[in-house]
Amino acid sequence: MTNLPKVTVRDLAESGVHFGHKISRWNAKIAPYIYGVHQENRIHIIDLRKTLPLLQVAMKVLYDVAFQGGRILFVGTKFQAFDIIASEAIRCGQYYVNHRWLGGMLTNWGTVSSSIKTLMQYEKILNDEDSILTKKELGNIEKKKQKLDKALGGIREMGAIPDILFIIDTNKEHIAVKEAKKLGIPIVAILDTNSDPDGITYLIPGNDDSRKSIELYCKLATDSILAGIESSLAKSGVKIDDIRGDEFIQEKEDGIVQTKRRRSKVYKEEEREVVTNEDESR
């Protein structure tokens, strides 16, 4: 029995998930998930009775991937989402892209891996107390390091292409969608009334612009992933009470899921609040 987070139609409504775009901006393919039109504002209203079961399916999928030790990549680069994407991905020990998606991030993974190695080399140089480089040279390396870290920091420990993507706004992240489709990587995505559902493996009709809505989606995704990890740990005989201060990951070795412990990247609530506030001043 899975221990998925609970969510109701009321929860969705209170977070504004039902508010779509102006009717002039709609994508006709999303029509099956539209309830009607708000006559005063002339925006489409999303049918939350259809959103809820699709959301629950997506949550179960994320749970299953996490249970099997899969890699999950959170993608959301729009201003309303970028800090939420990072903090929630980190909270469950997964990976994220929250600034510009670089073309080939999935389809040219070899080059991306090389760039990640370069990033780590820069960090090693900058942390070398015995470095003979000049202040100017170190400054140039610091700038290059910051640029790479902004683009790749959220996937530096991913190790390989992800098993599934969780995307906020498929229109903005169309390159990520295209690359995932090309490689056959499943996609869980929030689709607003101006979005194309074609090729999205697990779609969730909903408002992809409201921070409150985005916070709800990401929290549910993260809680589902954590539930999957905890169930996997319990099956491995690890006591959940013992994982405080540590992060457990599941890695596949020779077809077998191995449970390993590594330094936690999970924010404490107070730490997350500080980071979020700093990001919002961007």
Curated annotation (Swiss-Prot):
A Pfam family reported for this protein in Swiss-Prot or TrEMBL: Ribosomal_S2
GO CC terms, sorted: cytosolic small ribosomal subunit
Alphabetic keyword roster: Ribonucleoprotein, Ribosomal protein
Compositionally biased tracts (Basic and acidic residues): 266-282
Listed GO biological process terms: translation
Renumbered residue ranges of the record's region Disordered: 260-282
Domain of life, source organism: Bacteria
SUPFAM superfamilies (alphabetical): Ribosomal protein S2
Molecular-function annotations in GO: structural constituent of ribosome
Family: Belongs to the universal ribosomal protein uS2 family.
Name under which the protein is recorded: Small ribosomal subunit protein uS2
Source species taxonomy: Bacteria, Pseudomonadati, Pseudomonadota, Alphaproteobacteria, Rickettsiales
Gene: rpsB
